[in-house]
Amino acid sequence: MNADQLKQLQEPLKTKYRTEPDAALVTLKAKAKAGEGITCKIETGKSLAEAGLHPATGGDGLSVCSGDMLLEALAACAGVTLKAVATATGFNMKEAFIYTEGDLDFRGTLSVDKEAQVGFKEIRLRFQIETDEPNEKITNLIKLTERFCVVYQTLNQSNEIKTSVI
């Protein structure tokens, strides 16, 4: 896809969202069902995955780890956003790899140490980009990718999660 094709695809949506802001609000959903043992089956809309305990918390390693899925979601969203921004700005990118890493102290989730944080202490997002573009353009590409990546922004902001029982 080139910049003109992307613009043709997105311009009608942008126009609609400018005139009808409520149309831009879309509720994304996920559904999971508690599985056998200590697992949970997730319906992604495209496939079915089974999440389970990470080996560092007693899991057997046969199920996907929710923490890994979070990092995968960040890598996927950052990659799609990177490509969209590169396309829209005419950035010449031959190839790109997106890497995510996160540090977890499992003492927190296992309640071994009440001072240990439950959740990622730090998440790192790295881009390996093959391009002839100057560093200034690469820096701008990354800045725009961070700005428009939904998962990046969600993780980087404090968001309220409303929990309920139905």
Give each language-model segment a name:
Residues 1-72, 84-166:
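Extended beta-strand/beta-hairpin segments
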Residues 73-78:
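Alpha-helical metal-binding/catalytic segments enriched in His/Glu/Asp
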